[in-house]
Amino acid sequence: MQKATYYDNAGLFGGYSYPKSDSYTYGPTHQGFSSSSIENDYQSPICPIQTTSVRQATHKNGDINGSCMRPSASQGNSQPESISEQQQAAPLAASSPSPSTNSTQKKKSPSSNGSSTATPVISKQIFPWMKETRQNAKQKSTNCPAAGETCDDKSPPGPASKRVRTAYTSAQLVELEKEFHFNRYLCRPRRVEMANLLNLTERQIKIWFQNRRMKYKKDQKSKGIMHSPLGHSPDRSPPLSGSNHIGYSGQLPNVNSLSYDAPSPPSFAKPQQNIYGLAAYTAPLGGCIPQQKRYPGTEYDHHSMQGNGSFANANLQSSPVYVGGNFVDSMPASGPMFNLGHLPHPSSASVDYSCAAQIPGNHHHGPCDPHPTYTDLSSHHASQGRLQDAPKLTHL
């Protein structure tokens, strides 16, 4: 222990000359110094305020403390050398100004960190590997990729992590985007192939595809929010417009439409004059008077619709009428049938509707006329001859 401290202390004062051990004479009263006294002597030159008298008192205390131990002759020869040099260094430290004190402290500081017996000086030291780690952490947080490149391999913020964010090149991004265009989810064999092709790892490609899918999902969501209020949804149908759509309704949308409502047939008023196209059918019938009269819309009466869906006139005559393929003798109280009022029944005239129907009186078997007409049967009854609306044949 004392040899180790001697070698450490000898390194402190390498700039001083050491006298030989035979130049000193030792009496029986001289005692060896213990390690504690050497430590006290070693620590004393650090403080520049101490005087020589204080250091002599320290040596006396060292003599008292060292009387308990009897070291060997070799140890006794080596110890006084260090003590004498400490005594020589003490007046120099006390009398020299502050620059010399700083120089001695600078000489002692490297060896004091390495010595085991010195008092530990606790100071925060930053080693080069710590500096490099912090600089790398700053570069990770501050470095941004160039335009067209993305950093998808993100590292956690801890300083211990060594993972660096991946900056993909433009060629790699083109290949990855093309692959994403065809397949959003990449299978493992294709991932291995892409990794070998682009000189990347499977993990980097997998993370890139994950981030790209999230970006695509976000873009689709933003587009849906932007276009949904005015966009055409598939459950919406275009509104029905005007005369292009003729439905089965109680009212006629235009004059020439022929819509039919089963429960309630529409009431035909005077403006609807061309519903059945009476003015177009002007071909004469065989056996009829050649001078015919058309019935314009002004000669129609406003017929009231009865509850049973039949049209009737107030003044009904017993004239045979063809209704639904049958000849029916219209009676004055007949309700549920379509009647033709104010039509005289001369024996010499007949109306041929279907080439097979006959009216008693004059049996007329004429050829089929493709345009049957409702005509006035006698010219002298033209003033009071009125024609009601023709019935709709519901059995067809």
Swiss-Prot record:
- Segments carrying the region annotation (Disordered) are 18-163, 219-246, 364-396
Q: What SMART domains does the record tag this protein with? A: HOX
Which Cys pairs does UniProt list as disulfide-bonded? none
The record's DNA-binding region positions are 161-220
Q: Name one GO cellular component term.
A: nucleus
Feature: compositional bias, Polar residues? 20-56, 72-85, 375-386
The protein's predominant localisation is nucleus
Which Pfam families does this UniProt record tie to the protein?
Answer: DUF4074, Homeodomain
Q: GO terms for molecular function, please?
A: DNA-binding transcription factor activity, RNA polymerase II-specific; RNA polymerase II cis-regulatory region sequence-specific DNA binding
Gene3D superfamilies, per this entry? Homeodomain-like
Q: Which CDD domains match?
A: homeodomain
Q: Where is this motif: Antp-type hexapeptide?
A: 126-131
Keyword vocabulary terms for this entry: Developmental protein, DNA-binding, Homeobox, Nucleus, Transcription, Transcription regulation
BP terms from Gene Ontology? anterior/posterior pattern specification; embryonic skeletal system morphogenesis; regulation of transcription by RNA polymerase II
Please list the residue ranges that the record marks as compositionally biased, kind Low complexity.
86-104
Location in or out of the cell: Nucleus
Q: What does this protein do?
A: Sequence-specific transcription factor which is part of a developmental regulatory system that provides cells with specific positional identities on the anterior-posterior axis.
Question: Which family does the record assign?
Answer: Belongs to the Antp homeobox family.
Do you know which PANTHER family this protein is assigned to? HOMEOBOX PROTEIN HOX-D3 (PTHR45664:SF5), PROTEIN ZERKNUELLT 1-RELATED (PTHR45664)
Protein name as catalogued? Homeobox protein Hox-D3a
Query: Gene that codes for this?
Result: hoxd3a
